[in-house]
């Protein structure tokens, strides 16, 4: 039948046979009647049968289609294609939905979300990550979208820092008005090769007290071509809280936030799962490595009636020293990584 609206399937479960002569649908000429009647002959009826309606088809062919080796623009930090597709799928990427990646990099998550039909946008503190070395977004992330004929799924990418985002945030966390994203998917930087940084200066109070703008040849420094904004070290734990806070202020009701978080296998809560009262953790998938692992955390944006009248905004207390400045002090996982994840008593 062609063009059927509904498909039905029958599954049969058969018992394993020890007969080396059993062939489905045929009877070899050298098999005797005694063999057929023997105890080890193939059963004549299945153990169980299942009858059901076909509601969806597998998309495993997308894994080979999106193989990183076939992409024109990648980097050493590009997320594995299968994991990116799983992330976008768990975040419910689909037609008519707007998805955002605040750490876009080479756009692997955006491509996966666009494959499922979503309209995607991204940002990164370093514009070179999504546009290449001065080549432009068309030859960077855009080349990957063009490679899969998904140009319609790419909105744009901007240079931005999640803690200083120019995007609209809902003023009230208790009302849906002002929230506009249907999904957020990302793989935040772990800060291992170099410490995490955000826009700003180490001593922001001193900088804020300076009068006027810094001028060069009569032009504000930040308006000149090639301007590079100053950056300061930042805590990995606080960044996780920032991601949840950003999601709570931008995701519509029941929308999803999905991101990856590294953790040491024997950690005792130092890097526990971040929480926010406006977000419900619904999935926690673990990818183990040798001495560490990373988790795919998926949250659902709670509806107005599911949140208490006066919830605590920060759902988790961060135990950080107030004078933390170095990359290791701001990122406990980075410190453990370079210590080889040895127990504290084994560290000199």
Features from the language model and the residues they span:
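Class I S-adenosyl-L-methionine-dependent methyltransferase catalytic core
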Residues: 3-348
């Amino acid at each position: 039948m062609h063009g059927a609206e509904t498909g039905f399937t029958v599954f049969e479960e058969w018992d394993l046979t020890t007969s080396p002569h059993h062939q489905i649908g045929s009877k070899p000429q050298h098999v005797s009647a005694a063999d057929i009647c023997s105890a080890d002959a193939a059963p004549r009826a299945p153990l169980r049968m299942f009858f059901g309606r076909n509601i969806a088809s597998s998309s495993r062919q997308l894994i080979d289609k999106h193989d990183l080796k076939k992409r024109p623009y990648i980097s050493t930090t590009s997320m594995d294609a299968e994991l990116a597709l799983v992330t976008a799928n768990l975040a419910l990427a689909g037609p008519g939905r707007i998805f955002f990646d605040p750490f876009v990099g080479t756009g692997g998550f955006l491509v996966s979300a666009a494959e499922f039909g979503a309209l995607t946008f991204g940002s990164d503190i370093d514009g070179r990550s999504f546009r290449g070395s001065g080549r432009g977004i068309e030859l960077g992330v855009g080349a990957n979208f063009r490679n899969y004929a998904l140009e319609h799924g790419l909105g744009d990418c901007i240079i931005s820092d999640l803690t200083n985002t120019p995007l609209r945030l809902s003023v009230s966390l208790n009302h849906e008005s002002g929230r506009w994203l249907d999904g957020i998917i990302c793989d935040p930087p772990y800060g291992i090769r170099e410490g995490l940084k955000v826009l700003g200066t180490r001593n922001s109070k001193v900088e804020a007290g300076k009068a006027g703008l810094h001028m060069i040849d009569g032009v504000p420094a930040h308006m000149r071509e090639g301007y590079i904004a100053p950056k300061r070290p930042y805590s990995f734990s606080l960044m996780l809280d920032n991601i949840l806070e950003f999601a709570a202020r931008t995701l519509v009701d029941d929308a999803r936030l999905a991101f990856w978080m590294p953790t040491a296998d024997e950690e005792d809560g130092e890097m526990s799962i971040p929480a926010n009262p406006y977000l419900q953790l619904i999935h926690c998938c673990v990818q183990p490595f040798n001495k560490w692992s990373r988790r795919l955390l998926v949250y659902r944006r709670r509806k107005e009636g599911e949140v208490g009248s006066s919830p605590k905004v920060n759902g988790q207390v961060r135990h950080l020293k107030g004078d933390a400045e170095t990359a290791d002090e701001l990122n406990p996982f980075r410190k453990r990584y370079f210590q080889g994840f040895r127990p504290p008593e084994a560290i000199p």
